[in-house]
Amino acid sequence: MISSDFRAEARRKLVGKWGKGACIMLAFLLVTFVINFISGLLPDSYEWLGQIIDIVINVPLSFGVVYAFLKLYKDETVGAFDFFKLGFNNFGKSWSITFNIFLKMIVPAIVIIISYILIALGISLYSTSLFVTYSTPAINGYVFIAIIGFILLVVSSIWATTKYYFYQLAFLISMENEDMSAEEAVTESQKAMTGKRASLFWLQLSFIGWAILGAISFGIGFLWIIPYVHFATIAFYKYAIGDSSTVEVQSVNDDSKTAE
């Protein structure tokens, strides 16, 4: 399947649900606004506490939104604010999955940090050499350190991004397999995404035009665009795990294209 197939399936599943999807997004924005507003009331000396609270709360909220859209996709009854309950009822699971993904990503993250240190060190030493007499080899060495750091940053960033794609289905897998542990969900996501990471990347990239339209509409369009993206991602997830319903949709789409 290609990106257009997943988007077509998303539009098919969204028939009669566009309004509900927009309401879920509006409710999510309202809840996050209230949380951020309350965090903003904290004294400046406790700003760090507000940031920690935001992080702790945002993970289950994000989990809940994905869960709400999955239920909507499956034609289950879901209210606009149900994401809040769905998220916090699975507070431990959402954070356990996030932590397991963090452990998987820790090595590339360390490499990225090292690359930033090398860049900063190289630039700092080179800047100092402009005011202090250093030999040409030493100056060239500082430039070399910065260049190595930059190359390492590019390579490690690409590595981290491609590696992260392995785990993008972990939330969805855990939602449909309630008895599965967080570690198992992350592992199953990696298995499902093997050989399919590029497909998900191109699917996400195909929404760039919609993102521009959302920005032009002062963000209002995102109330409908984000549900569209979630539904397309769920369609991809169904395909990645071998769900027969998605295969059937692909067959229908292929037949219609052949007929044309």
Model-identified regions with their sequence ranges:
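Hydrophobic alpha-helical membrane segments
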Residues: 1-260
